[in-house]
Amino acid sequence: MAISRGDLVRVKRPESYWYNEIGKVASVDTSGIKYNCVVRFDKVNYAGISGTEGGANTNNFAESELEKA
């Protein structure tokens, strides 16, 4: 499927906060690790620090858990 940096992708990992959301690939690691694609999203997740806005807006996924949007 050859996902590369800058591609817009849809997340297909059902347990992910960003399931079926579209994000932009920030980097792809070619060293052989399982979750080699770092994807950046516009919205943040629920993991913010208590009393502050925000949370994480990136996550690692395997190429098999992504499809080009």
Curated annotation (Swiss-Prot):
Keywords per UniProt: Membrane, Photosynthesis, Photosystem I, Thylakoid
Domain of life the protein comes from: Bacteria
A Pfam family reported for this protein in Swiss-Prot or TrEMBL: PSI_PsaE
Gene3D superfamilies, A to Z: 2.30.30.50
Cell compartments where the protein resides: Cellular thylakoid membrane
Coiled-coil stretches noted in the UniProt entry, renumbered to this chain: none
InterPro entries associated with the record: Elect_transpt_acc-like_dom_sf, PSI_PsaE
Protein topology in the membrane: Peripheral membrane protein
SUPFAM superfamilies recorded: Electron transport accessory proteins
GO biological process entries: photosynthesis
GO CC annotations, alphabetized: photosystem I reaction center; plasma membrane-derived thylakoid membrane
Main function: Stabilizes the interaction between PsaC and the PSI core, assists the docking of the ferredoxin to PSI and interacts with ferredoxin-NADP oxidoreductase.
Protein family per UniProt: Belongs to the PsaE family.
Protein name (record): Photosystem I reaction center subunit IV
Species: Prochlorococcus marinus (strain MIT 9312)
Taxonomic path: Bacteria, Bacillati, Cyanobacteriota, Cyanophyceae, Synechococcales
